[in-house]
Design a protein with these regions (language model features):
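Beta-strand-turn-beta hairpins that frame and shape the catalytic cleft
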Residues: 1-4, 97-102, 106-112, 127-145, ...
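N-terminal, active-site-proximal structural segment of metallo-dependent hydrolase catalytic domains
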Residues: 1-98
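Surface-exposed cleft-lining segments at the edges of enzyme active sites
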Residues: 10-13, 116-124, 146-157
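Active-site environment of divalent metal-dependent phosphoester hydrolases
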Residues: 11-13, 42-44, 94-97, 150-153, ...
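Active-site neighborhood of phospho(di)ester-bond hydrolases with catalytic His/Asp-centered motifs
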Residues: 35-38, 87, 179-183, 205-209
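Conserved beta strand-loop-helix elements of the APE1-like EEP
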Residues: 72-80, 96-113, 227-246
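His/acidic metal-ligating clusters that form di-metal
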Residues: 131-143, 155-191
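Metal-dependent phosphoester-hydrolase catalytic domains
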Residues: 170-178, 186-255
Length: 255
């Protein structure tokens, strides 16, 4: 099985779709079984797309808009002959003009999708609102997340959010493998915080067990949300609830 997780930061720095050609090419080459995406944006004022091909909705309040990044990506891949089924969950307003959310793409048929509330805040206008997307196929379940920092304005929202993820997948874990993928905003080398919480709960980090590793850090210093940070960080993960043999772990698109 091949998996990919990516914080796309889509459309914020550029509206030129050609700049995402390397991502499309990489997916075409690797034929990932499942892809988790974060910061999947669409212009709030964009035209609505009715019945997008392959789309499985979890809610009806915020429809798919014309420049939804997951929709753009699925279309670009379909034009090259690679079909994905997919889902998208809107989380909160981004940069005042976007509906920002998370997405999952699956190469095999989707059995079910679910939107899970993680944060105490459920206000779409609040940047503190966090949600997860749970997608189930016949063979496995996948979760896309974009979680809070360990400490955010002197509070610890991460504890609540991770507990909500575990509650959401509790019943699935007895049926099939579960993979939680995404941007966790918690560095792997910081002890007694988010990373240790997850691994101590029995989740396996793909990087930690990979037979071969190409790269480590997933973000450079001083990105949005980590202003003032001077080090490259590993904050994006693929966790599995069961021990898995991992042949290769590779960092891509880390700029």
């Amino acid at each position: 099985m091949k998996l990919l997780t990516l914080n796309t930061y889509s459309w914020v720095q550029t509206a030129d779709p050609s700049l995402f050609a390397p991502l499309v090419a990489d997916i075409l080459e690797n034929q990932y079984d499942a892809i988790a995406l974060q910061e999947v944006n669409q212009l709030s004022t964009g035209p609505v797309i009715n019945d997008p091909v392959g789309y499985h909705a979890t809610q009806n309040e915020i429809p798919i808009k014309e420049n939804n990044f997951a929709y753009f990506l699925v279309k670009a891949l379909a034009e090259k002959g690679l079909a994905y089924q997919w889902s998208w969950v809107p989380c909160h307003v981004g940069y005042d003009i976007y509906d920002e959310g998370i997405a999952l793409l699956s190469k095999v048929p989707i059995q079910s999708v679910e939107q899970v509330q993680l944060s105490a805040s459920n206000d779409f206008e609040s940047l503190h609102t966090r949600r997860a997307l749970v997608l189930e196929t016949e063979a496995a379940a996948f979760v896309s997340v974009h979680l809070s920092w360990w400490k955010d304005e002197e509070e610890n929202p991460f504890l609540r959010e991770w507990a909500s993820v575990e509650t959401a997948v509790k019943n699935l874990r007895s049926k099939k493998p579960v993979y939680v993928m995404g941007d966790f905003n918690n560095p792997a080398d910081v002890r007694n915080e988010g990373y240790d919480l997850i691994t101590n709960d029995g989740w396996q980090d793909a990087y930690a067990v990979a037979a071969a590793r190409i790269g480590s850090a997933t973000v450079p210093p001083a990105i949005d949300g980590w202003e003032g940070n001077e080090l490259s960080l590993r904050i994006d993960y693929i966790f599995s609830d069961q021990p898995q043999a991992v042949e290769t772990y590779e960092v891509k698109f880390d700029g």
